[in-house]
Structures are given as C-alpha cells and as structure tokens.
Amino acid sequence: MAQNCNTSSTQKNGSATAAILIIGDEILKGHTVDTNSAFLCRGLRKLGITVERITVVPDVQEVIAKEVSQLSSTVTHLITSGGIGPTHDDVTFESVAMAFGEELYAHPEMTKLVEGFFGTVTSDSAPMKLAMVPASAKLNFGIDPQTGQRNRFPLVSVHNVYIFPGIPSLLEKSFNGLSHLFSGSGTTFHTREVFVNADETEIAQSLSKLQAGWGKRVSLGSYPDWLSNYHRVRLVLDTDSVEEVERARTQLIEELPKGSVVPLVTDPISVAAQEVYSLSKSETQLGKKVAAALGTIEMALDKYSVNEICVGFNGGKDCTALLHLYYAALKRRYPDGKDRLKALYIRIVSPFPEMERFLQDTIKRYDLELFSVEGSIRQALNEVKERRPDLRAVLMGTRRTDPYSHTLTPFCPTDPGWPDYMRVNPLLEWTYHDIWSFLRTLYVPYCILYDKGYTSLGSMDNSYRNPSLKMVDERGATRYKPAYMLENEEEERNSRE
C-alpha cells in the first residue's frame, strides 16, 4: 500500500514534520484518557518538529493500515501509540505490515527477549505476538537518561513509522531514550506568552490586524482561560526566529488595551521561597506582616519537626495564604528536604464543587499529604490524634478579626478536654486586605469563587455572594466584583449566614 517515505518531500519550510496515530478502542469509548499525544507534541516540538496531525483509530487492522499508508507518505515521522501486546486486539504490527505490503516474521532478537521475559514459548503462543514484526522492521534500543543503561526492550520502527507502546510510562521512557531518532532538523521554535486581563471580544480586532501583518512568519494563538484568577486570555506567539518573536511580542503588547497585560508568574510555587522572603524584606506594611508571620512559622519549625506539624487547610483565602507562607519557609530552611508538607482538611457538609476542585489542584501544586476527616473540629482532631499520633502542632489561618479570636496569641495550646495540640497562628495581625494583597502580589492561585462575589466561604448552604460587591455592567446585567475589590473589610462576612 505505502512506499518508503521520501523525507525531502515531507519537510515543511525546512522543518521536519510528524503525525501521531493513537490506536485503541478504549480511547474512542472514553474508557481511557489519552495523555500520550500531548506528551509527544511537547517532546517533538522541543526537537524542532512540527506535528501536523493527531488521529485516533479503533483496534481494526484495515483501518490502522489505511491511516499508516496515508500518513507515512505525507510526514517525516509517523508515531503510533498502542496496539502492542499479546491479546487479540493488539494488531499494530500486523497493520503496519499490511500498510507496507510486508509479511510478519519472528525476529530472532525479539524472540529471545520474549523468551527471557515469559519463559519458553511456542510459535502460536500469545506472548509470541510481541516478537512477530514486519519484515523490514528495525530494533531501536534507547538509553535510560537516569541510569545510562540500555533499555531492555526496543522500539520497533518500519521505514519512517515508529511503533510506541500505549502505556504512558513506557511510551515516555522509550521516547526520552530515543529522542535522537527525531532530532537533527536544525529548526528551533521560539515561543512567547502574553497574558491579558480582557475578554477575547475586546482584543479580537487587534489580533486579526497583527496576524495579517505577520503572515506566516509568526503564528498567534488566542486561548481563553475561565479558571484563572489573574487573566482571561493567554496569547501565544510562535516562530522559528528569535528576532521575529521578540519583535512580534513588542508589537502585540503595544496594540493591546492599556493596562490589560498581566505580568503573570506562571509557577509561583517553584519561586515561593525567593519571592516570599524578598517581600518580607521590603519596607512596606505588607512586607512587615509577612516578616512577622514567617517569624512565627520559623519559631514553630525550631520547636517541632516537619513531621510534627500540619496546616489546617479548607481552601479558603486565609489558609491559602498561610499554606504559601509555610511552603516558602520549608523550602528556605530545607531546600533539599524530602518530607511532604502535611495538611488537615475537615470536610464540611455540602461543599462547593469549585472548592473541592481547588483542593485537589492545591494538593498537586504543593505535593501535599492531606488528612481528610469529617465531623466537628473536636471529633476531627480526635480522629487525627488516633491516625497520626506524631502530629503535635497545627498551623491555622486565623485572624484576630475572626469570631472568638480577639484573645488569641501566636502559640495557643488547645483547651482542656480537647486533643492536645499546639495551635500556631501566624496571621493573627493580618487584615482582610493584607490577605488579598499577599495572594495577588505573588500571583498565588486561590479558589475561583472569590472572583465571583464571595468574600467568605463555608458550605453551599450558608455562603452567598456579598451584596457589597453587586454591580450593574455597561450592558445592564447584574454582576459581582471579585472579593479583593471589597472596600470595607468589615463587610467581609456579609456573604455568610
């Protein structure tokens, strides 16, 4: 069906090209999420290769063969994922052979590998499917970047078709060890991002004008982000010339509405220690509050080990600020520390779905070890005491203006009759505006509900948008300003029953 690719005819403006063929009924039926194509696109892009197409096909030999035949003749590299194995629906080798009009045969080296893994096998046994490859197949043994050792199992390629496994961990290991197979095009792509706090409709005309002027020299992508606390649109400039991309970025910023470009820190967690401690050394009022809070946290770390401390975390704005402070203090004190930051979550009845989603995102961002318990605070602490008797101190995001908190001190033992813990309160002297200034100065992610008019969050049964943030926009529609725009902080709890 297909002939061996003529590489020179599959270049695009001097750049190597690729197509990705994802094989598997489980993808098309929604049983499995495809992460392989995203990984491959990123990896190939870094190697200067333009991915022109991603196709998903079922485990049907004729369908796979047709796609392999068509795609392999139009791109420099065709990468397949999935359909390698001992079962009836693993038909990728057969399909590639059909595409190139070749027979399958038991490759001697593949046979040895199969026997070494499965033991003695017969020609008609299921494991032998792994050794049956197209006649012109080549075995490519990659090098593990971490160990420097040759990978045990090879990547099979046929002409310009590279047949990867479908299991993400195996595919990623194989690709990382064989990236040299796809390098050498000489192309380097240069990308710049611009974050804009404006709707796409407000900037669409400017973007069209700029793209028309640049033509094919620079590509401009516009991507709305409904879940960001700091921007509404991410603009991506892409070209193979660093001079062109820098020139385009300057033109883009000049063309956008004044004040709409956000100098976003895209990964505030990785620079937390540097940025938080830099802020603490400033002579601003916020800097002094940060320095005092860090002092309390550092005193706790002097007294307790990391494994004896946890952060009380429910996803609210105060404990989000506290978590970032504590994370910064830990990274400053133990830059190579392996202990995960521990957090205690007392789950309430009827939590907001947005809050639950934010909790899961936060666990990933900070690599938290989360203890989730239910019930009253006393019941929860009793349960934690049984499950984790080594914990001795709980960092809390309490402020002095919170109910029943005006007599607290930075270090407060729990009351008699309660489980024995030290309550550590680094934020006692912080105000509502201090919390928001800290979060937004450092671009720390927080629960999106705070951008929708909520100023204090509990459950869905007792939390409402704050009437003080209600407004009517230019279209006459009722909207709510974000929580950080609340002027009178004494009205903070007007959104709670």
UniProtKB/Swiss-Prot annotation:
Q: Does the keyword Mitochondrion apply?
A: no
Q: What is its EC number?
A: 2.7.7.2
> Which InterPro entries does this chain map to?
FAD_synth_MoaB/Mog-bd (IPR012183), FLAD1_M (IPR056596), MoaB/Mog-like_dom_sf (IPR036425), MoaB/Mog_dom (IPR001453), PAPS_reduct_dom (IPR002500), Rossmann-like_a/b/a_fold (IPR014729)
**Its Gene Ontology biological processes?**
FAD biosynthetic process
Which Pfam family, an example, fits this chain?
PAPS_reduct
- Main localization of the protein? cytoplasm
Q: Which domain of life is it from?
A: Eukaryota
* Alphabetized SMART domains for the sequence: MoCF_biosynth (SM00852)
Q: In which pathway does it act?
A: Cofactor biosynthesis; FAD biosynthesis; FAD from FMN: step 1/1
| Reaction equations catalysed | FMN + ATP + H(+) = FAD + diphosphate
Q: Which GO terms describe its molecular function?
A: ATP binding; FMN adenylyltransferase activity
Tell me its cofactors: Mg(2+)
**Which keywords does this Swiss-Prot/TrEMBL entry list?**
ATP-binding, Cytoplasm, FAD, Flavoprotein, FMN, Nucleotide-binding, Nucleotidyltransferase, Transferase
Where is this gene product found?
Cytoplasm
Region listing for FAD synthase, in residue ranges:
308-465
Instruction: Identify the stretch(es) annotated as Molybdenum cofactor biosynthesis protein-like.
Output: 19-110
List cellular component terms (GO): cytoplasm
Q: Per its UniProt entry, what is the enzyme's top EC class, as one word? A: transferase
Translocase as a keyword of this entry, yes or no, is no
Function, as annotated, reads:
Catalyzes the adenylation of flavin mononucleotide (FMN) to form flavin adenine dinucleotide (FAD) coenzyme.
Annotated family: In the N-terminal section; belongs to the MoaB/Mog family.
The record's comment about this protein's domains reads: The molybdenum cofactor biosynthesis protein-like region may not be functional.
**Name of the protein:** FAD synthase
